[in-house]
């Protein structure tokens, strides 16, 4: 006798019975759902699963397409596996690595014994199209971790072998696409035919894997030039290779062998060196007759802008300058005057949450050598107040203006460019899970923010995760379009960082109840953090950027 399950589908708000052991794809078809771009995965009791996942108990299910962030991650993983297979078939002695997101796509490196040409790109694209047309199934196999490690060692895939060997789990799984074996750490689509749209083009010394737009999946994302961002990523990838730490498996092995302190010291020293170089460049501009009066520091949420500005100020002081910090937060309009977003909620990420006329008035007065009384924003009352602090700048002073809109030309439209030095700060994660699995830079910042919000603002992880999509939307609209305007880019991510954040953020994430929608993201982050060996923060210096989020900083915030 077949046991029947009660399955609730969130997509159409209905419940139906299905036989025990039905796959998610069977359930999708049974509900007669029509998703214009097709399902690519599903949330089962708020946990993301592949469509071949079988159900043995009553469940709540929500099917996902590529208009969701989770669905797009599934699509990209599946697409990259196709690229891996294409390269394996075309270049048996070569390999491909997925380095990082850039220009609304993904930067990849083809490792062969010669410089790649346009004909190589065309061959790869054609082979990928053939693999998609063949509609080859992705198959998942679970086995003892020791056996999976040996499998990857035999194939020369030491990055995956090291990661799984240090993972600490009894069982691990791997995927196959025909004869091609690989490891991906979350859901894939059922078969290659699910991949409808992509492109691959030559991009500097590598390849750019282009993907559909989440807003309009019938079109590819437009390529956005990000030369400075690419340069920063590649510089740090070179540093990682010099240190011998390119993947999480490398990091885990180093930490297990007692080298965590060395990694902390070298990473912190590298950051301090970069900050000193930026301070020197500002000083040299002053000596060349280009009087820098403003240092504008921008970056997305939880990028470490505040600590960076304090450390830069110290370096400027060692060069004989007198920096004075000004936070754009103190120039917010009163909360009642804050613009509203499309959902009718206060849009604190909007440029117009800043009182632009008042800011420009005070800035002009200061630059004319006159005195102003600085404001202070009272976040409790939601009103701007005058602080009682008076400021007049002299020829040795530089204003350090920090805030998410600092690089927006509309903030300082009447200040000559030669009087401004612009810095973009972000946590650009350059370590990889393995050569085929990158770590999203947004994950790094989200983990920082969860810790900070819980520790200092009394927000739960559930609340921070719920707010994150609107924060990201604000970044896409107000911050990222201006990042290439920067005179300098500073990467605030530290090589060992995620291993240190792990012990702080895991207990907070575990408090998210599985009945709430945010559980899906909390569960994903917990699974991701499982791959890291923990590193204690006792060796972190008090001036570390991480101290802004963890506590124990010698700076006042």
Residues covered by each model-derived region:
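Ubiquitin-like/PB1-type beta-grasp interaction modules and other compact soluble beta-rich domains
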Residues: 2-104, 113-114, 123-127, 229
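Auxiliary tRNA-acceptor-end handling modules of aminoacyl-tRNA synthetases
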Residues: 53-72, 95-273, 278, 283-288
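Conserved NTP phosphate-binding and transfer environment spanning the P-loop NTPase/kinase superfamily
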Residues: 286, 413-557
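Hydrophobic anchor at the beta1->P-loop junction of P-loop NTPases
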Residues: 295-297
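Conserved lysine of the Walker
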Residues: 305
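Hydrophobic positions on the alpha1 helix immediately C-terminal to the Walker A/P-loop
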Residues: 308, 312
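Conserved nucleotide-sensing/catalytic segment adjacent to the nucleotide-binding pocket
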Residues: 324, 333, 337-380
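Glycine-rich phosphate-binding loop used to anchor ATP phosphates in small-molecule kinases
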Residues: 359-418, 468-482
């Amino acid at each position: 006798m077949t046991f029947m399950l009660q399955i609730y589908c969130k997509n159409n708000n209905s419940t139906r019975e299905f036989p025990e052991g039905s796959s998610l794809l069977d359930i999708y078809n049974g509900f007669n759902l029509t998703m214009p771009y097709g399902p690519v995965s599903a949330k089962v009791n708020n946990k993301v699963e592949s469509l071949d996942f079988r159900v043995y108990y009553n469940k709540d299910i929500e099917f996902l397409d590529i208009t969701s962030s989770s669905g797009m991650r599934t699509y990209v993983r599946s697409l990259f596996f196709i690229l891996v297979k294409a390269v394996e078939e075309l270049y048996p002695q070569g390999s491909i690595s997925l380095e990082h997101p850039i220009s609304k796509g993904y930067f990849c490196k083809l490792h062969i014994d010669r410089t790649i040409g346009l004909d190589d790109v065309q061959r790869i694209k054609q082979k990928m199209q053939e693999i998609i047309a063949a509609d080859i199934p992705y198959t998942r196999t679970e086995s003892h971790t020791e056996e999976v490690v040996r499998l990857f060692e035999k194939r020369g895939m030491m990055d995956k072998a090291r990661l799984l060997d240090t993972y600490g789990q009894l069982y691990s799984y791997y995927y196959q696409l025909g004869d091609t074996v690989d490891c991906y750490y979350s859901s894939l689509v059922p078969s290659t035919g699910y991949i409808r749209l992509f492109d691959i083009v030559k991009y500097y010394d590598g390849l750019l894997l282009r993907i559909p737009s989440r807003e309009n999946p019938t079109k590819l994302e437009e390529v956005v030039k990000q030369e400075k961002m690419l340069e920063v990523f590649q510089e740090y990838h070179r540093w990682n290779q010099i240190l011998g730490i390119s993947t999480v498996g490398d990091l885990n092995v180093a930490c297990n062998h007692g080298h965590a302190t060395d990694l902390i010291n070298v990473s912190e020293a590298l950051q301090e060196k970069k900050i000193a170089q930026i301070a020197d460049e500002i000083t040299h501009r002053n000596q060349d007759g280009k009087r820098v009066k403003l240092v504008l520091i921008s970056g997305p949420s939880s990028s470490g802008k505040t600590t960076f500005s304090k450390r830069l100020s110290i370096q400027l002081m060692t060069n004989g300058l007198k920096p004075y910090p000004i936070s754009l937060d103190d120039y917010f309009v009163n909360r009642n005057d804050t613009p509203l977003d499309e959902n009718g909620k206060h849009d604190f990420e909007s440029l117009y949450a800043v009182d632009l006329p008042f800011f420009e008035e005070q800035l002009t007065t200061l630059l004319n050598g006159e005195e102003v009384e600085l404001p202070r924003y009272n976040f409790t009352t939601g009103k701007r107040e005058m602080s009682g602090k008076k400021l007049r700048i002299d020829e040795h002073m530089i204003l350090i203006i920090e805030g998410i809109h600092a690089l927006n030309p509309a903030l300082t439209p009447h200040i000559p460019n030669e009087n401004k030095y612009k810095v973009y700060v972000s946590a650009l994660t350059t370590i990889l899970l393995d050569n085929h699995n990158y770590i999203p830079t947004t994950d790094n910042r989200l983990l920082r923010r969860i810790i900070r919000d819980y520790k200092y603002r009394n927000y739960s992880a559930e609340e921070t995760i719920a707010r994150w999509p609107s924060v990201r939307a604000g970044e896409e609209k107000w911050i990222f379009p201006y990042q290439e305007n920067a005179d300098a880019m500073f990467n605030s991510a530290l090589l060992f960082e995620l291993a240190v954040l792990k012990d702080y953020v895991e207990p907070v994430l575990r408090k998210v109840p599985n009945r709430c929608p945010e559980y899906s993201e909390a569960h994903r982050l917990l699974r991701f953090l499982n791959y890291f060996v923990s590193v204690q923060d006792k060796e972190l210096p008090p001036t570390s950027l991480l101290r802004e989020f963890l506590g124990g900083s010698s700076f006042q915030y």
